[in-house]
Amino acid sequence: MTRIAAFCGLILLSTCSATDPYDQSQVPLEVKPPADFKGKVILVVAGKSSHGPGDHEFFAGSAILCNLLKQTPGVWPIMVRDGWPKNESLFEIAESIVMYMDGRGGHPVVQKDRLAAMDQRMKAGKGWVNLHYAVDYLAKDGKTVLGWMGGYYEPDWSYNPHWDAEIRSLPKHPVTRGVKPFTIRDEWYYNMRFVDDFKGVTPILQAIPPDSTRGGAAPKEVKKHVGASKLETLAWCYDRPDGGRGFGFTGGHFHRNWADEDFRRVVVNAILWSAKVEVPESGAKVEFDAVDLNKNLDKKGKGEFKPILPPMKK
C-alpha cells in the first residue's frame, strides 16, 4: 500500500468511527415520484443480507446506485429492500427493474407465480438488469430469463472464481461512454449461458481468466467447452425483439469496488440505457465519496467493525 493510500485509509477510519455504519434508517424506501413527474422511474431491488461483512452488501450497494442514478436529470430511482417490493404496483410504473441479490433457487423472482407475471412485464418492453448473484438461475428458470436478458449464470455450466479481470478494451456503445479500460478483482462469473448465436447480445466487459480457474468440479463437457486463454464475457447488453433492453453484470461481490469510477459508471450507464435514458457522451455522472462505502451496511458477523477501504489500483 502506498503512503497516500495508507493516509487516505486513516482518514476513512476516523470518519467511519463517527457514524453508525449499520444505520439504514435514512434510506428512503418505495417512494413514488410526484404525480407530475415526467421522467423515467427505475426500480432498484436489494436482496436480503448475505455472505460476510463487505461482501454481497446488497442494501448498501443499492443505496449507492440510487444516489448515483439521482445525478442524472429526469430519473427517479425507487429503492426496495429484502428482495421484493411490499407494493408490487411499483413494477408497473418502472421503466427498468434492477435486481441485486442472491439468485438461483432462492431468487425472489422465481418464487410462487412471479416468473410468469414478470415475463408479461418484460414482453411489455420493461428493462431488466441483474447484478452479480442475481444473474444466477436454475436452468428451468433460465430459459425464461434468456428472453429478458440474453444470458445468465447456469449452475454446473458457468464458473464463479475470484480473479483480477483486466478490461483492456471496450466496444463503442452507450453503456461504455466515459468508461476507460480498468483492472479490478471481483468474483467475475464467466461461461454464461447465452441465446443462440449471441443474437441481440453485445459483450460490454470481456477479459481472459487465469487458466487455473477453469478446472474445479464442472462436468467434462463444460471443461471441454471452456478453452484455455479464452476471452470471456463478464457483462453484456441485450436488445430484445420486443424492444426491451436487458443487462447482465457478473461483478459486484466486493462492496469496495463501488469506489472505482469505471466500475460504477459502466453499471450506471447500463441501468440508464436499460430504461431508455440517453447516456451522455461523457458517460453518466457518478460522483462518489469513499466514506459512503461504510454507510447502510447489513450487520454481519460478531467481530469488531472493520471499515471497508477502496480497492487498490492495479
Could you tell me what each predicted segment is?
Residues 21-28, 70, 154-242:
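Catalytic beta-strand/loop cores that center a nucleophilic Ser/Cys/Thr
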Residues 60, 64, 113, 117, ...:
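Extracytoplasmic/secreted proteins, especially bacterial periplasmic and envelope-associated proteins
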Residues 5-15:
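Bacterial N-terminal signal peptides
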Residues 40:
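Nucleotide donor/acceptor-binding cores
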Residues 19-37, 64-67, 71, 212-213, ...:
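Extracellular ligand-binding/catalytic regions of CAZymes and related secreted enzymes
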Residues 23, 44, 50-130, 134-137:
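Helical hinge/lid and interdomain linker segments adjacent to catalytic or ligand-binding clefts
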